[in-house]
């Protein structure tokens, strides 16, 4: 038997993938990498200019851009109405707030849970009600290693991502009868604009890197490749799973 150079179990040819939070970081990298593997991508975010930048780096044709604020029910409804049926959903949009417990505000809790937890739940609800996720489709929730590892000052963020992980498991049970899979990925620190937003000083970041056995943070495209595995037919028997991608930091 000869070697087949065209064989690729991670191919996304013929698949339509929705990626939220695609205007930067992991979302942008995922859209670009999915397009390289043949997917038609629907990218969404609040900033049209940054979405256009993502689109300019993608390859192939047939991609769609939807500007929507999915932290609101109105934004979720706009997104669900404007898109066609999909074969994959990457629920990536998220925010971070870092505060000690005694400084929590109700507004902070509502904001972070609305974006990180409630919005993904409402998008899935809307897509399923409209029957817009195709049979054998795949859902990937971008959670965080913070769902497992308790870092000082990170309680709100970690709780919102842990809730998303728990929801993923219930979602996986419910959609399995339709042949749809649901999984979550849990990155640790990834070198994106998200970590350079003044939440941490550069000195704190450099010190934190020493905790990683691989001595660096992850790259957005490395997270994207793990997402692609869970979107592709290579993971056809994988559902309800939480995949940790953290450069070994959880080993300590």
Kindly label every feature range from the protein language model:
Residues 129, 173-177, 236:
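Alpha-helical segment proximal to the catalytic Tyr-Lys
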Residues 124, 160, 168:
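Active-site helix of classical SDR
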Residues 90, 176, 181, 238-240:
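Short, small/polar-rich loop/turn modules that mediate ligand/substrate recognition or access, typified
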Residues 23-24:
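Conserved glycine-rich cofactor-binding loop
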Residues 144:
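Residue(s) in the substrate-gating loop at a strand-loop-helix junction
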